[in-house]
Design a protein with these regions (language model features):
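Conserved N-terminal alpha-helix of the aminotransferase class I/II PLP-enzyme fold
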Residues: 54, 61-94
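Conserved PLP-binding active-site segment in aminotransferase class I/II-type PLP enzymes
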Residues: 1-17, 27-30
């Protein structure tokens, strides 16, 4: 079946954060947004059909997923990642960030240390600080355009700061790493050795590029499974963020009970009916749609790679292994953060995510979302090129 990912759908006026709140966030209303991580594509037709059925029924009472819901989710992870799950491991929440914040409260005390790896998805840092925990950073090492983990620093930071919990971003947002087996095993070994619980955010797991394979952290070893919480959701894969459903897997019974208690303390009870229906439909019927989408995104990546290489070589692409988010290095332009913001927002009329918000090591970078029609991407890069060419360049020869 051919899905039309070239179709441009008007999103303004649909209450979407990406398009409708530029003014409230300090941007001009005519900027082209490629910042927040949702897609400019409709979800799979099969998901829409299931939602239409729910709406036609017309009753939106309290709801809960049954056996078919768990079967859909578990079958997806078994088929795509070789990971066998059990139903009692599953805890549903309204979002992965919600789950991470709940885990921080459940497994650490105020003032205790939580480890992350910046530059990284900025709500990690917010969740740590908002819950009055101490942020400890194991900065990723950038070498020849490739990010790696400094394991010596990783273990030292854990020991010196008596870290209790580690937030793993896998695949990594924004740098695009898909961690290799040996890297995940080293993380698991160090964390077990020092009694550090691993919270693995695997929300981008369905988006990997050829030659790279996502590995569920809990699938590697039984002892890792007993020392981790796996955070998943259909929201990135099927563009369902607004329906607010996440599937959190916790194999360890004691950890699961403590996590459930932390969730209950927030007053949260059930996920919403539309989210349940969409999630089940997506995992039951969305495989063909996703395969075509990934092919389209691969084409978008190649377009960006070629465009920058031929027309904007001073802006460097960090070659992604996964996600539909690209990490662009603007440092060769020689601009301050304020000057780059002016270039992008006022001259290029683009709304990207400034690298600085992702923490230490993000300065001089921008994150761009390529999950959009190619015409949108072509327009964005054209505007960027025009803005760059209008100013003197500070390029090292």
């Amino acid at each position: 079946m051919g899905y039309d990912f070239d179709r441009v759908i008007e999103r303004r006026g649909s209450l979407c954060i990406k398009y409708d709140f530029a003014k409230e966030r300090g941007r001009a209303e005519d900027v082209l947004p490629l910042w927040v991580a949702d897609m400019d594509f409709q979800t799979a037709p099969e998901v829409l059909e299931r939602l239409h059925g729910v709406v036609s029924h017309g009753i939106f009472g309290y709801s809960e997923g049954k056996d078919a819901y768990f079967k859909a989710v578990s079958t997806w992870y078994q088929k795509h990642f070789g990971w066998e799950t059990e139903r009692n491991w599953l805890v549903k929440t309204p979002g992965v960030v919600f789950a991470i914040a709940a885990a921080i409260r459940a497994f650490t005390k105020e003032g205790e240390a939580v480890l992350l790896q910046q530059p990284v998805y900025y709500p990690f840092a917010e969740a740590i600080r908002d819950n009055r925990r101490r942020l400890v950073n194991n900065p990723l090492k950038l070498t020849d355009g490739h990010y790696e983990i400094d394991f010596e620093d990783f273990e030292e930071k854990i020991i010196v700061n008596e870290v209790k919990l580690f937030l793993l971003c896998s695949p990594h947002n924004p740098v695009g790493r898909v961690w290799k087996k040996w890297e995940l095993e080293r993380i698991g070994e160090i964390c077990l050795k020092h009694g550090v619980l691993v919270i693995s955010d695997e929300i981008h797991s369905d988006f990997t590029y050829p030659g790279h394979t996502h590995l569920v952290f809990a699938s590697l070893r039984k002892e890792f499974a007993e020392n981790c919480i796996i955070c998943t959701a259909p929201s990135k894969t099927f563009n369902l963020a607004g329906l607010q459903v996440s599937n959190i897997f916790i194999p360890n019974k004691e950890l699961r009970q403590r996590f459930r208690k932390a969730v209950a303390q927030t007053g949260y009870s059930q996920v919403n009916l539309m989210g349940l229906a969409a999630t089940q439909a997506a995992y039951e019927t969305g495989e063909e749609w996703l395969a075509e989408l990934k092919g389209y995104l691969g084409g978008n990546l190649e377009f960006v790679r070629t465009f920058l290489g031929e027309r904007l070589p001073e802006i460097k692409l960090t070659e992604p292994e996964g996600t539909y988010l690209l990490w662009l290095d603007f440092r060769q332009l020689g601009l301050t953060e304020e000057e780059r913001e002016e270039l992008l927002v006022k001259k290029a009329k683009l709304w990207l995510d400034s690298g600085a918000i992702f923490g230490a090591g993000g300065e001089g970078f921008e994150r761009i979302n390529i999950a959009c029609p190619k015409s949108t991407l072509r327009q964005a890069l054209g505007q960027l090129e025009a803005a760059v060419r209008e100013r003197p360049l500070a390029i090292d020869n």
